[in-house]
Amino acid sequence: MHEYSIVQSMLDLIEENAKKHNAMKVEKVVVKIGVMSGVEAHLLKIAFDTFKEGTLCSDAELEMIIQPIIAKCRACKKESRFEKNEIFYECKHCGDVDLEIVDGEDMILMQLDMN
Protein backbone atom coordinates (compact mmCIF):
# COMPACT_ATOMS: atom_id res chain seq x y z
CA MET A 1 0.00 0.00 0.00
CA HIS A 2 1.93 3.03 -1.26
CA GLU A 3 -0.51 5.40 0.46
CA TYR A 4 1.59 5.02 3.63
CA SER A 5 4.72 6.37 1.94
CA ILE A 6 2.67 9.12 0.28
CA VAL A 7 1.27 10.21 3.66
CA GLN A 8 4.72 10.12 5.25
CA SER A 9 6.08 12.42 2.52
CA MET A 10 3.00 14.64 2.80
CA LEU A 11 3.44 14.94 6.59
CA ASP A 12 7.11 15.88 6.09
CA LEU A 13 6.06 18.60 3.63
CA ILE A 14 3.34 19.85 5.99
CA GLU A 15 5.76 20.02 8.94
CA GLU A 16 8.26 21.91 6.77
CA ASN A 17 5.61 24.45 5.76
CA ALA A 18 4.30 24.78 9.32
CA LYS A 19 7.79 25.49 10.67
CA LYS A 20 8.41 28.01 7.89
CA HIS A 21 5.28 29.89 9.00
CA ASN A 22 5.88 29.43 12.75
CA ALA A 23 2.69 27.38 13.11
CA MET A 24 2.21 25.24 16.19
CA LYS A 25 -0.70 23.21 14.88
CA VAL A 26 -2.30 22.17 11.60
CA GLU A 27 -6.09 22.13 11.72
CA LYS A 28 -6.98 21.17 8.16
CA VAL A 29 -5.23 19.59 5.19
CA VAL A 30 -6.81 19.77 1.73
CA VAL A 31 -5.53 17.52 -1.04
CA LYS A 32 -6.69 17.11 -4.63
CA ILE A 33 -6.53 13.50 -5.82
CA GLY A 34 -6.75 12.81 -9.52
CA VAL A 35 -8.70 9.69 -10.41
CA MET A 36 -5.71 8.55 -12.52
CA SER A 37 -3.14 9.26 -9.78
CA GLY A 38 -3.15 5.70 -8.48
CA VAL A 39 -4.01 6.95 -4.99
CA GLU A 40 -6.97 5.29 -3.28
CA ALA A 41 -8.76 7.98 -1.25
CA HIS A 42 -10.06 5.65 1.48
CA LEU A 43 -6.59 4.15 1.99
CA LEU A 44 -5.03 7.62 2.07
CA LYS A 45 -7.49 8.61 4.82
CA ILE A 46 -6.62 5.51 6.87
CA ALA A 47 -2.90 6.18 6.43
CA PHE A 48 -3.29 9.86 7.33
CA ASP A 49 -5.27 9.05 10.48
CA THR A 50 -2.64 6.48 11.46
CA PHE A 51 0.49 8.56 10.86
CA LYS A 52 -0.73 11.99 11.98
CA GLU A 53 -0.56 10.98 15.66
CA GLY A 54 2.29 12.76 17.44
CA THR A 55 2.70 15.35 14.68
CA LEU A 56 1.50 18.92 14.18
CA CYS A 57 -1.41 17.31 12.30
CA SER A 58 -2.60 15.16 15.20
CA ASP A 59 -5.97 16.96 15.34
CA ALA A 60 -6.12 17.90 11.66
CA GLU A 61 -9.04 17.15 9.37
CA LEU A 62 -8.18 15.71 5.96
CA GLU A 63 -10.35 17.01 3.12
CA MET A 64 -10.01 15.21 -0.19
CA ILE A 65 -11.14 16.69 -3.49
CA ILE A 66 -11.49 13.97 -6.11
CA GLN A 67 -10.44 15.35 -9.49
CA PRO A 68 -11.89 13.72 -12.62
CA ILE A 69 -9.86 13.47 -15.79
CA ILE A 70 -9.81 16.66 -17.84
CA ALA A 71 -8.49 16.30 -21.38
CA LYS A 72 -7.94 18.97 -24.02
CA CYS A 73 -8.69 18.03 -27.61
CA ARG A 74 -5.82 18.82 -29.95
CA ALA A 75 -8.29 19.14 -32.85
CA CYS A 76 -10.96 21.53 -31.52
CA LYS A 77 -8.99 22.83 -28.47
CA LYS A 78 -11.96 22.25 -26.11
CA GLU A 79 -11.77 20.42 -22.80
CA SER A 80 -13.76 17.32 -21.89
CA ARG A 81 -14.32 15.71 -18.50
CA PHE A 82 -14.06 11.95 -18.03
CA GLU A 83 -14.55 9.48 -15.21
CA LYS A 84 -11.93 6.85 -14.47
CA ASN A 85 -14.20 3.97 -15.43
CA GLU A 86 -14.67 5.15 -19.01
CA ILE A 87 -12.96 2.68 -21.33
CA PHE A 88 -12.48 4.89 -24.38
CA TYR A 89 -11.68 8.59 -24.33
CA GLU A 90 -12.81 10.79 -27.19
CA CYS A 91 -13.55 14.50 -27.32
CA LYS A 92 -17.09 15.10 -26.16
CA HIS A 93 -17.32 18.07 -28.53
CA CYS A 94 -15.95 16.81 -31.86
CA GLY A 95 -15.30 13.08 -31.33
CA ASP A 96 -11.56 13.24 -31.99
CA VAL A 97 -9.32 10.89 -29.97
CA ASP A 98 -6.15 13.05 -30.02
CA LEU A 99 -6.39 14.27 -26.44
CA GLU A 100 -3.94 15.72 -23.93
CA ILE A 101 -4.62 15.00 -20.25
CA VAL A 102 -4.48 18.35 -18.40
CA ASP A 103 -5.81 17.31 -14.97
CA GLY A 104 -6.67 14.20 -13.00
CA GLU A 105 -3.31 12.42 -12.95
CA ASP A 106 -1.75 13.94 -9.82
CA MET A 107 -2.20 14.31 -6.11
CA ILE A 108 -1.62 17.89 -4.96
CA LEU A 109 -1.44 19.44 -1.50
CA MET A 110 -3.84 22.35 -2.02
CA GLN A 111 -4.29 24.03 1.37
CA LEU A 112 -3.14 23.98 4.98
CA ASP A 113 -5.04 25.69 7.78
CA MET A 114 -2.49 26.37 10.53
CA ASN A 115 -2.28 28.13 13.88
Curated annotation (Swiss-Prot):
GO biological process: protein maturation; protein modification process
Keywords: Metal-binding, Nickel, Zinc
InterPro entries listed in its UniProt record: Hydgase_Ni_incorp_HypA/HybF_CS (IPR020538), HypA/HybF (IPR000688)
Keyword Zinc: yes
Domain of life of the native organism: Bacteria
Pfam families assigned: HypA
Binding site residues for Zn(2+): 73, 76, 91, 94
Residues engaged in binding Ni(2+): 2
Gene Ontology molecular function terms on file: nickel cation binding; zinc ion binding
Protein task: Involved in the maturation of [NiFe] hydrogenases. Required for nickel insertion into the metal center of the hydrogenase.
Family membership: Belongs to the HypA/HybF family.
PANTHER family documented for this protein: HYDROGENASE MATURATION FACTOR HYPA
Protein name per the record: Hydrogenase maturation factor HypA
Name of the encoding gene: hypA
